[in-house]
Amino acid sequence: QYSWMCLSSFALSWRSYKHTNSQFLYFAPDLVFNEEKMHQSAMYELCQGMHQISLQFVRLQLTFEEYTIMKVLLLLSTIPKDGLKSQAAFEEMRTNYIKELRKMVTRCPNNSGQSWQRFYQLTKLLDSMHDLVSDLLEFCFYTFRESQALKVEFPRCWWRSSPT
């Protein structure tokens, strides 16, 4: 659940960045949230958090290649409940993607010698995803629990059998 929520919210930020230059939250072509819709939502603060991630994409002028590597790193930041068959192989894979992100940042023509700072900003952005995703999962769990509490169960004797 955590990995799925992480990827979904990161992808939402990317779509918002690409389709609306982060002016709106772009869930889907027919579901775009402006500030007013965010306010009407029960998850206004979470929408603001997702919007902030998208605004960071604009500020950093994130490339698709950086986004893709960061997405993989988000996946690799979650260890399965059952553990790993090979912790060493997992760490090696994660380290390789971190190195790849560092290479990508170094090759970026817009950096002009500030690659270490950009790398720091990108990894800081990844770190900020974890708090947001934890809050999103908590909201989903709370909403699920509330919906379960509102379920009405009727005694079996009230059930009407269909006429045959």
UniProtKB/Swiss-Prot annotation:
Its main location: cytoplasm. The keyword Membrane applies. The keyword Plastid does not apply. It is found in: Cytoplasm; Nucleus; Endoplasmic reticulum membrane. Composed of three domains: a modulating N-terminal domain, a DNA-binding domain and a C-terminal ligand-binding domain. Heteromultimeric cytoplasmic complex with HSP90, HSP70, and FKBP4, in the absence of ligand. After ligand binding, it translocates to the nucleus and binds to DNA as a homodimer and as a heterodimer with NR3C1. Binds the coactivator NCOA2. May interact with HSD11B2 in the absence of ligand. Binds the coactivators NCOA1, TIF1 and NRIP1. This is Mineralocorticoid receptor. It comes from Sus scrofa (Pig).
